[in-house]
Swiss-Prot record:
<dbReference type="InterPro" id="IPR014284">
    <property type="entry name" value="RNA_pol_sigma-70_dom"/>
</dbReference>
<feature type="region of interest" description="Sigma-70 factor domain-4">
    <location>
        <begin position="351"/>
        <end position="404"/>
    </location>
</feature>
<comment type="similarity">
    <text>Belongs to the sigma-70 factor family. RpoD/SigA subfamily.</text>
</comment>
<dbReference type="InterPro" id="IPR009042">
    <property type="entry name" value="RNA_pol_sigma70_r1_2"/>
</dbReference>
<dbReference type="InterPro" id="IPR012760">
    <property type="entry name" value="RNA_pol_sigma_RpoD_C"/>
</dbReference>
<feature type="DNA-binding region" description="H-T-H motif">
    <location>
        <begin position="377"/>
        <end position="396"/>
    </location>
</feature>
<dbReference type="Pfam" id="PF00140">
    <property type="entry name" value="Sigma70_r1_2"/>
</dbReference>
<comment type="function">
    <text>Sigma factors are initiation factors that promote the attachment of RNA polymerase to specific initiation sites and are then released. This sigma factor is the primary sigma factor during exponential growth.</text>
</comment>
<comment type="subunit">
    <text>Interacts transiently with the RNA polymerase catalytic core.</text>
</comment>
<dbReference type="InterPro" id="IPR007630">
    <property type="entry name" value="RNA_pol_sigma70_r4"/>
</dbReference>
<dbReference type="InterPro" id="IPR007624">
    <property type="entry name" value="RNA_pol_sigma70_r3"/>
</dbReference>
<dbReference type="InterPro" id="IPR007627">
    <property type="entry name" value="RNA_pol_sigma70_r2"/>
</dbReference>
<keyword id="KW-0731">Sigma factor</keyword>
<dbReference type="InterPro" id="IPR036388">
    <property type="entry name" value="WH-like_DNA-bd_sf"/>
</dbReference>
<dbReference type="InterPro" id="IPR028630">
    <property type="entry name" value="Sigma70_RpoD"/>
</dbReference>
<dbReference type="InterPro" id="IPR050239">
    <property type="entry name" value="Sigma-70_RNA_pol_init_factors"/>
</dbReference>
<dbReference type="GO" id="GO:0016987">
    <property type="term" value="F:sigma factor activity"/>
</dbReference>
Length: 416
């Protein structure tokens, strides 16, 4: 398939004034004549005006090589539009091209290795036939068979010549089909530009819109059926619009939205605009949802999805010394919180080490310091094979020790 780059570079296209707006050019004689008729007698002022006029004239006459869009519009403007009978003829050749390319793909389907595998299988089949028949064909038998089939050397040469003739005709039809497809596409590139202009300022540059629209035009040329009686431009318009709108949906946003959601957002905007004109005020969410036959919850979800992302580095305030990210609460732990938690764990271990081993183990199990699960007095008693009351006494004694200023002074810093 011809790529969009080929569409933009292979064309050799009179300038279509409907597609671009060029300022009217003036030559030096017009400028000088205008200046002579000026009643200003100040020579210095006249000299400055003359120099300014010449600079403007030079700017107007800059080569278009600095503006690729204008060059492209000039080139495609030189391509003549097709007549109805020409469209039909080109469409027939393109349909023939598609059939030939399918045939060509079928013949080129196997690689050399795969063809070798096919030959190997044929030889295996031949060997099995020989084994089953329990005898090998003799040379005399082969000669007799060839004599019956009348495969003479002149006949084989005639077949070879015919195959070369057919291959040459096949290549010619492929070439003419591809040229017909090129001509059909190039003759309708102005249609792509006219449609692309309607989708400007939607997230893609004008060049990208033309590129995507050209791909849609190529697809239209391949799918066009002239027997249905439609003009090609009418048929191609849908394909061009579809290619452009899908590209906008896929590429224009930082966070990609599904195409169907993008289309719904476009319908919401259009409905809002229509209701605003009818009511002469901004419509409410309920009015928009009722008009579009959807729930308010779905409307709000789609509207929220349509919001554009904003950078966390966006300056805030008159002095612009703060950033948006400074005012957003983080869901996870900050580095400071993580460091503080690690220090608390270390200090808590040091304090627990001042207790007896049994007191330390009871507090660990009671408050879930190891696995995060707090155990009951009865569960801990079963672990140590003592009564529930004995565990309560051990816990109370350990807590009294921890309340001593020599032990809890370090831990109090974390709760201030």
């Amino acid at each position: 398939m011809m790529q969009a780059h080929d569409v933009l570079t292979l064309t050799e296209p009179p300038l279509d004034l409907d597609l671009i707006d060029l300022d009217e050019d003036f030559d030096d004689e017009d400028i000088e004549l205008e200046l002579e008729e000026t009643s200003d007698s100040n020579d210095g002022k006249k000299t400055r005006r003359l120099a300014s006029a010449r600079r403007r004239d030079a700017a107007r006459k800059k080569p278009y090589t600095e503006d690729s869009i204008r060059i492209y519009l000039q080139e495609i403007g030189r391509i003549r539009l097709l007549r109805a009978e020409e469209e039909i003829e080109l469409a027939r050749k393109i349909a023939d091209l598609l059939k030939l390319e399918r045939i060509r793909e079928d013949f080129c389907l196997y690689s050399d290795a795969e063809w070798g595998k096919q030959v190997f299988l044929f030889e295996r089949i031949e060997k099995i036939i020989v084994e089953k028949s329990e005898k090998e064909p003799k040379l005399s038998d082969i000669k007799a068979y060839l004599g019956k089939t009348e495969l003479t050397a002149p006949l084989l040469e005639e077949w070879l010549a015919k195959s070369k003739e057919y291959l040459s005709a096949f290549k010619r039809r492929l070439y003419h089909g591809r040229r017909a497809k090129e001509k059909m596409v190039q003759s309708n590139l102005r249609l792509v530009v006219s449609i692309a202009k309607k989708y400007m300022n939607r997230g893609l540059s004008f060049q990208d819109l033309i590129q995507e629209g050209s791909l849609g035009l190529i697809r239209a040329a391949e799918k066009f059926d002239h027997e249905k009686g439609y003009k090609f431009s009418t048929y191609a318009t849908w394909w061009i619009r579809q290619a452009i709108t899908r590209a906008i949906a896929d590429q224009s946003r930082t966070i990609r939205l599904p195409v169907h959601l993008y289309e719904t957002i476009s319908r919401i905007k259009k409905t809002t605009k229509i209701l605003s004109q009818e009511m002469r005020r901004k419509p409410t969410e309920e009015e928009i949802a009722t008009k579009m036959e959807m729930t308010i919850e779905k409307l709000r979800f789609i509207a929220k999805s349509a919001q554009l992302p904003i950078s966390l580095e966006t300056p805030i305030g008159k002095e612009e010394d703060s950033r948006l990210g400074d005012f957003i609460e983080a869901d996870g732990e900050t580095p400071e919180d993580e460091v503080s938690k690690n220090l608390l764990r270390e200090d808590l271990e040091n304090v627990l080490d001042t207790l007896s081993p049994r007191e330390r183990d009871v507090l660990r199990l009671r408050y879930g310091l190891d696995d995060g699960r707090m155990k009951t007095l009865e569960e801990i008693g079963q672990i140590f094979n003592v009564t529930r009351e004995r565990i309560r006494q051990i816990e109370a004694k350990a807590l009294r020790k921890l309340r001593h200023p020599n032990r809890n002074s370090i831990l109090k810093e974390y709760i201030r």
